[in-house]
Every structure is written in C-alpha cells, then in structure tokens.
Swiss-Prot record:
Entry protein name: DNA/RNA-binding protein Alba 1
Species of provenance: Archaeoglobus fulgidus (strain ATCC 49558 / DSM 4304 / JCM 9628 / NBRC 100126 / VC-16)
Residue pairs linked by disulfide bridges in the UniProt entry: none
Pfam families associated with the record: Alba (PF01918)
Gene Ontology molecular functions: double-stranded DNA binding; RNA binding
Family statement: Belongs to the histone-like Alba family.
Keywords: Chromosome, Cytoplasm, DNA condensation, DNA-binding
Subcellular location: Cytoplasm; Chromosome
Keyword DNA-binding belongs to the record: yes
Coiled-coil region: none
InterPro entries in the record: Alba-like_dom_sf, DNA/RNA-bd_Alba, DNA/RNA-bd_Alba-like
GO CC entries: chromosome; cytoplasm
Function per UniProt: Binds double-stranded DNA tightly but without sequence specificity. Involved in DNA compaction.
GO biological process: chromosome condensation
C-alpha cells in the first residue's frame, strides 16, 4: 500500500490530484492520500476533486484520523493527521 500513497503538503491542489490520477491510471485499485496539520483541508480537497470531477467510479473506502506527537525545541506538539483511502468501485 505504501507505493500507492500521496503525501499532501504545500504545493497546489492540482499537483496532488494529478498524482492520484497517475496512480489509478497505472493500475492501482486503491490510493491513500495522507496529510498532517494545515494540509488536511488540502487533502480533503484532493479527494473530492478526484471523485467529483475526474473519476466518478472512485469511492472513499476509509478515512483514518490520528494525532502525532512532534518533538521540537519548545517541547512536544500534537499534530493532527488524516489518511483518506480511495478505491475503485
């Protein structure tokens, strides 16, 4: 499953949409979209754009949310994370 993952960051949304479409077009039946922190809303946008505009035969199979502890100089910070799994019908 790791090879079919798209990690969402600060790039424009369409870059990640293209990455997901490329995964599906290369034969993947499931693609995982992962994001942390502020990129979570961008990951949701990616999943919705793929489903509504490009691949109507793709559904959300699972959504996992979690909290990760990040150690920094100021101590530990909690960062939210999401994983959206898209699968072909």
């Amino acid at each position: 499953m790791a090879e079919n993952s798209v990690f969402v960051g600060n790039k424009p949304v369409m870059n990640y949409v293209l990455a997901v479409l490329t995964q599906f077009n290369s034969g993947a039946t499931e693609v995982s979209i992962k994001a942390r922190g502020r990129a979570i809303s961008r990951a949701v946008d990616v999943a919705e754009i793929v489903r509504k505009r490009f691949l109507p035969d793709v559904d959300v199979k699972d959504i996992k949310i979690s909290t990760e502890q990040i150690d920094s100089e100021q101590g530990t910070a909690n960062v939210s994370a999401i994983e959206i799994i898209l699968a072909k019908k």
